[in-house]
């Protein structure tokens, strides 16, 4: 990290830092003085929210960050998932971004991968709403890459 990073949290808000969950009881500002892996509570996807292929991929990438003990398992599941998604999507923008997301995770930049995945949600919603990906394929993906269900 080249400079410090300052984050403000409201009372009752949680933040996930290097696998630990912290909740603040009042408005606070945190200043990170070195490299840290963190997720703000509003960026944490719960399992029941992982309802589409890209949201499932997000959930898996998120687990790489917030569950360091299970990082190897989550990374293996991410590899399986990204391979499946690359063969299922036809949209060139999504395919190019999935390749970039794979490279981000491969180089230890899962946090950046999460941001990139969130950026694809609108395109994915369009694809699913227009049935450009058959519902049977969506269901197959859901079954294959959702072991937490």
UniProtKB/Swiss-Prot annotation:
A Pfam family (short name) is: FlbT
Question: Its Gene Ontology molecular function terms?
Answer: mRNA 5'-UTR binding
Q: A GO BP term, please?
A: mRNA catabolic process
Which keywords are on file for this protein? Bacterial flagellum biogenesis, Repressor, RNA-binding
| UniProt keyword annotation of Coiled coil present | no
The text of the family note is: Belongs to the FlbT family.
Which HAMAP family does UniProt cross-reference here?
A: FlbT (MF_00783)
Function, in words: Has a post-transcriptional repressor function in flagellum biogenesis. Associates with the 5'-UTR of fljK mRNA and promotes its degradation.
User: Protein name, please?
Assistant: Probable flagellum biosynthesis repressor protein FlbT
Q: Which organism is it from?
A: Rhizobium johnstonii (strain DSM 114642 / LMG 32736 / 3841) (Rhizobium leguminosarum bv. viciae)
